Curated annotation (Swiss-Prot):
Keywords: Disulfide bond, Protease inhibitor, Secreted, Signal, Thiol protease inhibitor
Motif position, Secondary area of contact: 83-87
Name the record gives this protein: Cystatin-C
Task performed by this protein: This is a thiol proteinase inhibitor.
Annotated Pfam families: Cystatin
Family the UniProt entry places it in: Belongs to the cystatin family.
Signal in keyword set: yes
Cleaved signal peptide residues: 1-28
Top-level lineage group: Eukaryota
Disulphide bond pairs: 101-111, 125-145
Presence of the UniProt keyword Nuclease in the record: no
Length: 148
């Protein structure tokens, strides 16, 4: 009876080892990229159209809430991340600079940054923007800015 169980047990042991090696991340180099966590944060290209739309909205809200005489706009997107929820959350870390355009001017995209040292101002801001594109809804959930 011991001999009749030997072969099936050996095959079972080989199967267990093969499965362990197949699913273990430490079992050697993986050739495929790990699947993303559903609802997890992912880095995104700051130049994507939807990221730029979220950035423009965050800039607009920043300027509305600022007591500064001048508009500010993004100098650099340091990091852009996205999370798919019941819409899309964007987490943007942005270096913002003061422009030469006063708040009475409307075309912010063409405003140059101040080059006079006493008028230059840079802020490092973290924005959390929530967008529901199919409802045409966007809101700024969090904004935290520090002098850079």
């Amino acid at each position: 009876m011991a001999r009749s169980l030997g072969v099936p047990l050996l095959l079972l042991a080989a199967l267990v080892v093969a499965l362990a090696l197949a699913v273990s991340p430490a079992a050697g180099a993986r050739t495929r990229q790990s699947p993303r966590l559903l609802g997890g944060l992912e880095d995104v290209d700051a130049q994507e159209k939807d990221v730029q739309r979220a950035l423009g909205f965050a800039e607009s809200e920043y300027n509305k809430g600022s007591n500064d005489r001048y508009h500010s706009r993004a100098l650099q997107v340091v990091r852009a991340r996205r999370q798919i929820v019941s819409g899309v959350k964007y987490y943007l870390d942005v270096l913002i600079g003061r422009t030469t355009c006063t708040k009475t001017q409307t075309n912010l995209a063409n405003c140059p940054f101040h080059d006079q040292p006493d008028l230059q101002r840079k802020m490092l801001c973290s924005f959390e923007i929530y967008s529901v594109p199919w409802l045409n809804k966007i809101s700024l959930l969090k904004s935290d800015c520090q002098n850079a």
